[in-house]
Amino acid sequence: MKKLRGIPLPEEKQGLVRYTCLCYRELPKYTQEKIQRLCAEAGGAYSAALWEVMCTRETVTAIALRHHVGESTLYRARKEFYVRWFRKR
């Protein structure tokens, strides 16, 4: 995975979040709930689309078309997801 430029986290932390999400089905329930909560907080009405962005290998374009949402909206939500992952509650 290469570093996503617009996200203010080092490549290692971005990779940690991305690869954790890609293993969603094998994760403990509390981590799955964290991912779902962050999708709801960062994605709002588009939380299902954001979940697909984070937990599948599909392109943002394909997900945006299927969910009738702009790509830029998903990119903003994805950025917020990454930032919130490390925020203390």
Which ranges hold each PLM region?
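Short phosphate-engaging motifs
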Residues: 59, 81
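C-terminal flanking helix
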Residues: 82-89
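Short amphipathic alpha helix immediately N-terminal
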Residues: 41-58
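Flexible domain-boundary/linker segments
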Residues: 52, 66-67, 80
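N-terminal interaction/assembly modules
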Residues: 1-41, 61-62, 67-68, 73, ...
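Residues in the recognition helix of alpha-helical DNA-binding motifs
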Residues: 77
